[in-house]
Structures are given as structure tokens and as C-alpha cells.
Amino acid sequence: MFKKKKYTVIRQAISKDLATFVANYFVMQKQVYDTCKQARYISPFENIIGHYEGQDEQIPGTYSQYSNIAMETLMLKCQPKMEEVTGLKLYPAYTYARIYKKGDELKRHKDRFSCEISTTMNLAGDDWPIYLEPSGEVGKKGIKVDLKQGDMLVYSGCELEHWRNKFRGKECVQVFLHYNNRKTPGAKDNMFDKRPHLGLPSWFK
């Protein structure tokens, strides 16, 4: 299905128990970040254990993290399944996790090169569908994809517009896992999003 439509859904890509464990870990990390920031033990500009996105980022005021080590490990765990469903050999690029809050909205967009073969996985929280436009045409209505805990949408991030309407729930923990097709020109040089290895922050390139 992926090769034809450029997207597919993997139901129970990971177990609900594992999804809950990873989500609880990330929620606790947010709590640690909040406490340390409030007590001024860390700079508000420090992002090595996450940060709240600024006005120039996709979801202002929402806690997120590039390259959380648990999420990067999850990306490697999911890589064999990703290669199976896409029929491609992949290089891991990076991960990005968020704890969405009520009122958040993910605007329609396409992704950068490191997100060539992407996933979004539901780890925990209230339901929040994602939409994508399989034709690749900008501005079309698109299709709705519902993901339950542990489910994962696989899609061509650079080709298909994707978005989420305004979130009406309380909290939703999601992670994006990003890969490159090994046969794509430039993919090898882009491995790990041009970092020396996985787990490093975005500025370590």
C-alpha cells in the first residue's frame, strides 16, 4: 500500500504497555524540566531535556523535544517494521516528540529532507486525528486518519501535505520517527540528521 499511495497505517506498531511506558517517561521528563526551570537550575534556553516551542516554531507554547534518547531508541526498534511495510532500506534521521495541549493545531505543511519517510505514533492521551493529502496536491481536502495507542501512520513527509485540526482534548503524547530512503541521493550524508550519532541535540552537527 505504501508504494502505491505513499502512506499506510501500522496498527499496534508497538504494544499499549510499551506506548504507555514511553509516554509516562516523557511526561515525567516534562515535569522535571518544569521544576528545574522554575527553580532556575536550568536556563530557559536549554533544550537538552526538551523545551517549550517559541512563536517561530510549529506549536508555540507546547513541550517538545528533538532527539529524546528513548524516542531515538524506539526509532531503531521500529526500523525493521518500517522497512517491511515500505519495501525500502532506510537510514534513521531523527525523532521529535510532543505533549500536545488543548487548542494546539498543526498547520498544513510538507517536511524537510530528513523527514522523507516519516511516521507519527500515538503514545497516549486523547484521540486526535491527523489528515493528509495522498495526491500530493496542495490545498485539497485530504483524508482523516485515526490512530489509537501504539498505532503509527507511515507517510512520505516531503511529498504529502499533512496537518491536524485544533485539538479539543486535554493532552496527547505523540512522537515523529523520521528516516531516509538509502537509495535517495544525499541520504547517506544525511544519516542521523547529520549528527555524529543518534541521541544528540539538534545543534550538535
Language-model features: locations:
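Acidic/histidine-enriched, glycine/proline-rich intrinsically disordered or flexible terminal extensions
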Residues: M191-K205
